[in-house]
């Protein structure tokens, strides 16, 4: 998988940008529970009072606190407030604080955060001291100053500190808020408006963060799609380019259906995984770690619940991953098998129908289909177990948080809003793992797909251009020499060709004939370097073909395969395939030589007539003639015909060979011709007779009829004595 991911390198900037956006999205998501907590704790429970420090306080209330304060506390309080009298108060101040119209009020100065915290704790202590004194005064029906003179302030301050330590921070904060709320009410302030303003302002902030999160998510989705699509495009191009450079040996390693699957299905699998990785896998750890940090900062003693849940989730994911990974590997191979069966069925449909074997092929397909269905059911069921388990864990975690959290709320350790925020963070942690779990469904298949693609990309090309290529001699043209050539297919024990030696001359035709399996097609496929010789050498124009570039070698060859192969497009595009800059005269001449002019001219659109993939909309003979015309357009030095006249009738065959021979004489082109019919090679300048990979005869027809027994047998099996005598 990691070897394939190197193709993401051109998109590193977009990936970094996506990561930054994910971080922004996570920040927005993690901020919203804090605002929800503040809305519940401060906005609802504390009536919008944010701080434990009085922003405004009446003079008599402040003086009552100073009764319980020591000298340093008095200095802190008096230095933090300024006295405003009704005569000096502004109109705005009187509107906001109606009590300023009739009595003196202290307003909080602009103090730093450290001093504000110290002031808050001091006021809380004084408030609790006042509660202690007031409680005893009520019990003894005495005045507060009287009690202070009798018992002293320190005794009550000590009791207040003890009470604060017993109560949780939540309870103390709530009690402090009640003092502030009462004071603000006595000041005539609109507490309902204060509460509404706080809730609305906090709610708008939440909406802003939600909008920011949505924008980040949309941008990440856009970037992820572009990165994955670009990655897939580059990878497909790389695979396609690699396959186009495969030798026949490499192509035999992978089936056609497998290469198609690897280029389409496997790369598509990786594309989907990259999108999910950028949108989920990268996001999940950010949101998960961030939520855990917020949980730890919250001070709630329930982190162990999350730790337990995470351990269980990881265990389940790893277990299922280990079970399904091998099955996904098998599944991809079965998809290859299915494609192979379908391809064979479609290619051989005429033969299947001719022998009434539709039922047999249906059984083959049903078997392949059943195998895929069986393993798909297994993997799908295994993965389907994940989601219910995760939902169960999520609900169980929620119940545990509520159970243990309610006890902490009851003891005053935390507030209700804090429990709600904790639940939100816990859900974010669990959802992060849930998202990763969803991706793990794709990761095993993606890993298998990556390995299969890497197999193609890492395959060593067996036929390569030399590091220091030579150039062809300008003094020679169309000379092909075989020198003690032997060849065997990779992995085979026996040689297909053994010690073959001959030489062709420009403008002459060299024909190859022999029984089926004698090595005729193999021999001529060595000339364009579709395979490399096992031993010996092949020279073209005096240069070993292994010492020149393949492109240079093949540019001198006009190759016509045994099975005429046309590409989708039209007749003209197929003919121009061998020489893009061919003129109209070149095309017309090629059609004439290949005896294609007549049937092409009869088509309504002429050479612009459409050709289906594989040339399925023309007859076999027409397909073969157009294949020959394509080679002729190039005007090559060397023609290679691999039994290319077998689909032609005798009359067309004779006309075509006559026209071709005339053209080759004019252009001094060499012809290498594989034939099954003696009649096609009677007038060849040189005939090579092959038998079981060995050259058993070489010469003209007349010479071979005298010297080669194998040739005599072939000739007598195809022609009568009278026909042979008249040759």
Region spans (language model):
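Membrane-integrated ABC transporters
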Residues: 1-32, 38-206, 212, 216, ...
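ABC-type nucleotide-binding domain
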Residues: 15, 51-54, 65-66, 71-73, ...
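Hydrophobic alpha-helical transmembrane bundles that constitute the permease/transmembrane domains
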Residues: 23-31, 207-218, 270-273, 277-289, ...
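Juxtamembrane helix-loop junctions of ABC transporter transmembrane domains
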Residues: 28-44, 200, 209-256, 260, ...
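Short intracellular "coupling" helices and adjacent cytoplasmic loop segments at the cytosolic face
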Residues: 44-51, 58-65, 70, 144, ...
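Extended hydrophobic secondary-structure segments
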Residues: 220, 245, 252-281, 288, ...
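Helix-loop-helix
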Residues: 290, 294-311, 315, 321, ...
């Amino acid at each position: 998988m990691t070897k394939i991911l190197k193709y993401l390198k051109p998109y590193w900037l977009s990936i970094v940008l996506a990561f930054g956006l994910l971080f922004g999205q996570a920040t927005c998501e993690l901020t919203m529970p804090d605002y929800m907590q503040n809305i519940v704790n401060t906005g609802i429970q504390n009536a919008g009072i944010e701080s434990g420090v009085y922003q405004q306080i009446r003079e008599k209330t402040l003086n009552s606190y100073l009764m319980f304060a020591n000298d340093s506390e008095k200095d802190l309080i008096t230095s933090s407030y300024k006295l405003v009298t009704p005569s000096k108060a502004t109109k705005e101040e009187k509107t906001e604080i109606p009590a300023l119209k009739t009595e003196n009020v202290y307003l909080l100065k602009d103090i730093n955060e450290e001093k504000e915290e110290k002031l808050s704790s001091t006021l809380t202590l004084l408030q609790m001291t006042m509660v202690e004194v007031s409680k005893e005064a009520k019990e003894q029906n005495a005045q507060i100053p009287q009690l202070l003179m009798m018992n002293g302030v320190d005794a009550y301050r000590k009791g207040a500190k003890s009470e604060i330590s017993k109560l949780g921070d939540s309870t103390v904060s709530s009690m402090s808020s009640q003092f502030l709320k009462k004071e603000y009410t006595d000041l005539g302030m609109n507490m309902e408006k204060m509460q509404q303003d706080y809730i609305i302002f906090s709610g708008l902030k939440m909406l802003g963060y939600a909008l920011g999160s949505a924008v980040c998510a949309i941008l990440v989705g856009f970037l992820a799609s572009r990165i994955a699509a670009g990655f897939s495009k580059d990878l497909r191009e790389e695979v396609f380019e690699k396959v186009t450079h495969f030798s026949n040996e490499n192509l035999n390693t992978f089936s056609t259906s497998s290469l198609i699957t690897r280029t389409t299905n496997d790369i598509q699998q990786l594309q989907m995984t990259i999108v999910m990785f950028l949108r989920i896998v990268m996001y999940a750890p950010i949101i998960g770690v961030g939520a855990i940090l917020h949980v730890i900062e919250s001070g709630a003693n329930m982190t162990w619940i999350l730790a337990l849940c995470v351990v269980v989730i990881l265990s389940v994911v790893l277990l299922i991953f280990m079970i399904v990974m091998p099955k996904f590997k098998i599944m991809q191979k079965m998809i290859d098998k299915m494609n192979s069966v379908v391809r064979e069925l479609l290619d051989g449909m005429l033969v299947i129908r001719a022998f009434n074997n539709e039922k047999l092929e249906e059984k083959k397909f049903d078997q392949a289909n059943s195998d895929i269905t069986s393993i798909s059911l297994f993997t799908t069921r295994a993965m389907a177990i994940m989601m219910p388990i995760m939902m169960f864990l999520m609900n169980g975690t929620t119940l545990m948080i509520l159970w243990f959290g309610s006890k902490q709320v009851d003891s005053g350790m935390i507030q209700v809003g804090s429990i709600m925020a904790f639940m939100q963070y816990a859900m974010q942690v669990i959802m992060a793992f849930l998202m990763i779990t969803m991706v793990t469904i794709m990761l095993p298949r993606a890993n298998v797909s990556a390995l299969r693609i890497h197999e193609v990309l890492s395959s060593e090309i067996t036929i390569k251009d030399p590091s220091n290529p030579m150039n062809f001699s300008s003094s020679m043209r169309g000379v092909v020499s075989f020198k003690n050539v032997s060849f065997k297919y990779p992995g085979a024990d026996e040689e297909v060709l053994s010690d073959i030696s001959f030489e062709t001359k420009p403008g002459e035709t060299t024909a190859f004939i022999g029984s089926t399996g004698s090595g005729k097609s193999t021999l001529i496929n060595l000339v364009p370097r579709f395979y490399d010789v096992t031993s010996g050498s092949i020279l073209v124009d005096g240069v070993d073909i292994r010492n020149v570039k393949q492109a240079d070698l093949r540019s001198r060859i006009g190759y016509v395969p045994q099975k005429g192969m046309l590409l989708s497009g039209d007749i003209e595009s197929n003919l121009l395939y061998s020489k893009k800059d061919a003129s109209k005269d070149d095309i017309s001449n090629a059609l004439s030589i290949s005896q294609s002019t007549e049937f092409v001219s009869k088509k309504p659109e002429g050479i612009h007539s459409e050709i289906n993939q594989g040339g399925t909309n023309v007859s076999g003979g027409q397909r073969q003639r157009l294949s020959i015309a394509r080679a002729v357009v190039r005007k090559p030095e060397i023609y290679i015909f691999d039994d290319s006249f077998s689909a032609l009738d005798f009359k067309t065959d004779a006309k075509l060979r006559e026209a071709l021979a005339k053209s080759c004489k004019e252009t001094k082109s060499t012809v290498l011709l594989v034939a099954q019919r003696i009649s096609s090679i009677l007038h060849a300048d040189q005939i090579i007779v092959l038998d079981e990979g060995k050259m058993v005869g070489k010469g003209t027809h007349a010479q071979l009829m005298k010297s080669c027994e194998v040739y005599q047998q072939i000739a007598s099996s195809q022609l009568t004595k009278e026909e042979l005598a008249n040759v």
